[in-house]
Amino acid sequence: MVTLRFLQKNRFIHIISFLLVLSSCSSSPELVQVRLKLDDLSKQWVYLCQWDGNQNAVVDSVRTNSRGKAKLEFRTHNADLFAITADKKEFPIVIVANPGDRIVIDGNFRNYKVVGSKESAEVKAMQDRLNSFHNDFEGLRFQLPDSVNTPVNDSIARLINLKIDSLKSEYSNFVKSYVSGNLFSLSSILVLTAKVGEMDVLPYADNRLLFIKVDSCLNRVYGDKPIVKSF
C-alpha cells in the first residue's frame, strides 16, 4: 500500500512536470528555416523583411554563396508574413512562415518554387496568376484603337472592352473564391490588396463586406500584428 501511494504521488509529479514542459513548449517561439537556392543571386546579400506598420523593415540578412545558396533562421509563435529582397525596393519573394516550417525556395529571384510551406506555395501561385492576368489585361488594352471615330474602330473597341470586362470578372471571382476559403490566412491580405498598375483588383467599394469579414477574422487571431492593424 505504501508503495502504491508512492507511485501515485510520483506519477502525479511526473504528470505535472510533463504539463509544465508542454506549456513551456507552446509558449516558446519555434525555429523556422528558409533555405535559398537562387541561381541568379551569386554572392549577394539578401534581406528578410517584415511590415512594421510603416514599411518593410529588415529583420535579418544573409549573403549567398557562389551557387546562390543561403539559409535564414528565425523564430515565431504563429504564422508570420515575410518578404525577401536583394535591393530593399522590390520584394518578389513573399512567404507565410508557420512555427517549425522548413521552407526551400528554389529557382531564381523572379521564377522560383516553394517547398515546405503550403501557404507560401499558394502565395506564389497567386502571384503567378496575377502576373498572367496583368499580361493578358495589358495585351488587350494595347489592341484598343487610338480613336473610335469610325464605326469599325468603335466596333473593335467595344469587342475588346467586353473581353477586358470578362477577364477582370473571371479573375475577380477567382480571387474572391480564394479569400472566402482562407479568411483566417495572412495571405488573404496580399490577395485582397493586389493591384495591376494603379487599378485595384478588388475595389473596396464593390467588395466592402468581404474586406470587413477578412479584417474581423484576422483580428481574432493576429490582432497584434502590424500588417493586420494596417489592413
Give short role names for the model-derived ranges:
Residues 175-179, 192-196, 215-219:
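Amphipathic alpha-helical segments within well-ordered protein domains
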Residues 1-37:
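Bacterial Sec-dependent N-terminal signal peptides
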Residues 117-120, 185, 225-228:
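Serine-centered coil/turn micro-motif
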Residues 179, 183, 203-206, 223:
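Structural signature of alpha-solenoid helical repeat scaffolds
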Residues 184-198:
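Amphipathic alpha-helical repeat scaffolds of TPR domains
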Residues 210-231:
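N-proximal helix/coil linker or "cap" segments that precede and/or mark the start of modular domains
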Residues 165-172, 204-212:
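Helix-turn-helix repeat elements of alpha-solenoid scaffolds
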Residues 25-178:
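A non-transmembrane, solvent-exposed segment enriched in polar/low-complexity residues
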